[in-house]
Design a protein with these regions (language model features):
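Polybasic/polar functional segments that serve as interface/processing modules
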Residues: 1-112
Length: 112
């Protein structure tokens, strides 16, 4: 599966239709290709993932409870391709280049 990360941050209020248009116009990519598209908010506190599954679009968002996404690709191209393990690190607010992610507070199971 191809994973594209948009270099430029996007307005966090954008919905599926706006992100599909952004994929076409800014990233020169087909949003119906089955590719995962990653977008970061301007404040770097949330990350959105857009995907098409053959029937419709999925839009998922992760908002950090604390801190910011410190790593994000840069460059002259509109997007960067990531491998699956790099995307997993990115979702954990880590750095795919150094293969490191920050430690977060532990979530205990609810008492029964």
């Amino acid at each position: 599966m191809r994973i594209l990360v948009a270099i430029e941050p996007v307005d966090g209020r954008k919905g599926i239709d706006s992100l599909v248009q952004l994929c076409r116009e800014k990233l020169s990519a087909d949003p119906f290709s089955g590719c995962l598209f990653f977008f970061r908010s301007r404040r770097a506190t949330s990350l959105r993932v857009l995907a098409y599954d053959g029937q419709g679009f999925w839009l998922a968002q992760k908002r950090l409870s604390k801190g910011r996404f410190v790593w994000w690709p840069s460059g002259s191209e509109p997007a960067r391709t990531l491998e699956a393990y790099q995307a997993q690190l990115l979702l954990a607010a880590g750095n795919p280049d150094t293969l490191a992610a920050p430690l977060w507070r532990r979530v205990d199971a609810p008492a029964s």
